């Protein structure tokens, strides 16, 4: 779910915190990517086109196709991705997970009704709602990434929290996900739409944590309380409080405790046994692996391993897989060259700089000739001692 209404609130009140760029703008950057979000995108993208890519046994492969070609595109653009996979969800998320299970049951019933009625639009809509990333999808994606030479991290809990920890430790530049709670976990940069298909022509949207705090006139602790008021995965929100009212309350009272002391109970209903304090602590101190102990390495791809893994039962085209492996190798070599070039920085050669250099060379030449002439003349006019 992420944080309800947060992106619009930032766009309305702190637009300076958002910048849109082409993918190539992030050339040379390391980016931590929410793997489950990516796999979900790849699965629903193919479902929306009406059919699942599958093995000879009917097992889906669209998540692998998406991961393979989208990762190649990132590397082609000079971006070094590291994929972060979810671990176990925190206990406080059980309520949200139960709601998702209920919505899934409703979607299954609605899909059956749409199928019986021959409603193509309804079939597509409810098919998308039934997509779920499984442990098997994640396992296969990790195997593929290893063969591609791209690192991944198994988060002990929430992937967004682990991504944020990598950003804060300086291991990567940004978190790439569609869930805004990466900012609530303290990621200083958040990239949305980075892993969208090229056909969608969506510019990458970059959110700056420092600029959004400045624009909203709050600190990081107050921002966490704002996100809880807006609605997060860990607890219910107060009914009747929308995004604009939430930021007004935070700007006035600075924390949830003081807001509750001053809230008009005739207008707003606070959830019974509201676990906002536990939710706050989950954002402040999430369960993550120590980022300093994580060693990120991008290595050469295993072309034969990729062919064996993707072709055969998974029915990928061997020629395309080999071409993809060559692109991976080329990207690896280009990144090595960039690192070498960074040791030998040269200033750009502008017309003014070139002309100035020519003038200096000519002046130096004239000075040398004059000096030579004087020395020669002095030698001829001097008597030997």
From Swiss-Prot:
Its cofactor is Mg(2+). DNA binds at residues 47, 70, 158, 231, 233. Keywords: DNA damage, DNA repair, DNA replication, Endonuclease, Exonuclease, Hydrolase, Magnesium, Metal-binding, Mitochondrion, Nuclease, Nucleus, Phosphoprotein. Residues 368-385 have a biased composition (Basic residues). GO terms for biological process: base-excision repair; DNA replication, removal of RNA primer. It is found in: Nucleus, Nucleolus; Nucleus, Nucleoplasm; Mitochondrion. Mg(2+) 1 binds at residues 34, 86, 158, 160. Residues 336-344 are annotated as: Interaction with PCNA. Phosphorylated. Phosphorylation upon DNA damage induces relocalization to the nuclear plasma. GO terms for molecular function: 5'-3' exonuclease activity; 5'-flap endonuclease activity; DNA binding; magnesium ion binding; manganese ion binding; RNA-DNA hybrid ribonuclease activity. Binds 2 magnesium ions per subunit. They probably participate in the reaction catalyzed by the enzyme. May bind an additional third magnesium ion after substrate binding. PROSITE patterns: XPG_1 (PS00841), XPG_2 (PS00842). Its main location: nucleus. InterPro entries: 5-3_exonuclease_C_sf, Flap_endonuc, HhH2, PIN-like_dom_sf, XPG-I_dom, XPG/Rad2, XPG_CS, XPG_DNA_repair_N. Residues 346-385 are annotated as: Disordered. GO terms for cellular component: mitochondrion; nucleolus; nucleoplasm. Residues 122-253 are annotated as: I-domain. Mg(2+) 2 binds at residues 179, 181, 233. Its EC number is 3.1.-.-. Residues 1-104 are annotated as: N-domain. Structure-specific nuclease with 5'-flap endonuclease and 5'-3' exonuclease activities involved in DNA replication and repair. During DNA replication, cleaves the 5'-overhanging flap structure that is generated by displacement synthesis when DNA polymerase encounters the 5'-end of a downstream Okazaki fragment. It enters the flap from the 5'-end and then tracks to cleave the flap base, leaving a nick for ligation. Also involved in the long patch base excision repair (LP-BER) pathway, by cleaving within the apurinic/apyrimidinic (AP) site-terminated flap. Interacts with PCNA. Three molecules of FEN1 bind to one PCNA trimer with each molecule binding to one PCNA monomer. PCNA stimulates the nuclease activity without altering cleavage specificity. Belongs to the XPG/RAD2 endonuclease family. FEN1 subfamily. PANTHER family: FLAP ENDONUCLEASE 1, FLAP ENDONUCLEASE FAMILY MEMBER. This is Flap endonuclease 1. It comes from Drosophila simulans (Fruit fly). The gene is Fen1.
């Amino acid at each position: 779910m992420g944080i309800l209404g947060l992106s619009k609130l930032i766009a309305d009140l702190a637009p300076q915190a958002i910048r849109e760029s082409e993918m190539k703008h992030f050339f040379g950057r390391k980016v931590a990517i929410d793997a489950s979000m990516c796999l979900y995108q790849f699965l629903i993208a193919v479902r929306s086109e009406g059919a699942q890519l599958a093995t000879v046994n009917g097992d889906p492969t669209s998540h692998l196709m998406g991961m393979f070609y989208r990762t190649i595109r990132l590397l082609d653009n000079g971006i070094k991705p590291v994929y972060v996979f979810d671990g176990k969800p925190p206990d406080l998320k059980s309520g949200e997970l139960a709601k998702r299970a209920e919505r899934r049951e409703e979607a299954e019933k609605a899909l059956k009704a749409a199928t019986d009625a021959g409603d193509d639009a309804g079939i597509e809509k409810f098919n998308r709602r039934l997509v779920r990333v499984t442990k098997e999808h994640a396992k296969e994606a990790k195997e593929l990434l290893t063969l591609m030479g791209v690192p991944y991290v198994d988060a002990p809990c929430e992937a967004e929290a682990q991504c944020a920890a990598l950003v804060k430790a300086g291991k990567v530049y940004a978190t790439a996900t569609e869930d805004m709670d990466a900012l609530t976990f303290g990621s200083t940069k958040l990239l949305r739409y980075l892993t969208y298909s090229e056909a969608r022509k969506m510019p990458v949207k970059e959110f700056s944590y420092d600029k959004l705090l400045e624009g909203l006139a709050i600190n990081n602790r107050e921002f966490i309380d704002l996100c809880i008021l807006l609605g997060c995965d860990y607890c219910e929100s107060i009914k009747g409080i929308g995004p604009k009212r939430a930021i007004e309350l935070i700007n006035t009272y600075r924390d949830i405790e003081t807001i509750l002391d001053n809230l008009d109970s005739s207008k707003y209903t606070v959830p019974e046994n509201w676990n906002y304090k536990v939710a706050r602590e989950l954002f402040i101190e999430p369960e993550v692996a120590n980022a300093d102990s994580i060693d990120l390495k991008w290595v050469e791809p295993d072309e034969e391993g990729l062919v064996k893994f993707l072709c055969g039962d998974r029915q990928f085209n061997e020629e395309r897989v080999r071409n993809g492996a060559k692109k991976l190798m080329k990207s690896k070599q280009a990144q090595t060259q960039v690192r070498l070039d960074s040791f030998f920085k040269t200033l750009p050669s502008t017309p003014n700089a070139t002309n100035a250099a020519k003038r200096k060379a000519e002046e130096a030449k004239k000075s040398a000739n004059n000096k030579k002439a004087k020395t020669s003349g002095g030698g001829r006019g001097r008597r030997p001692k």
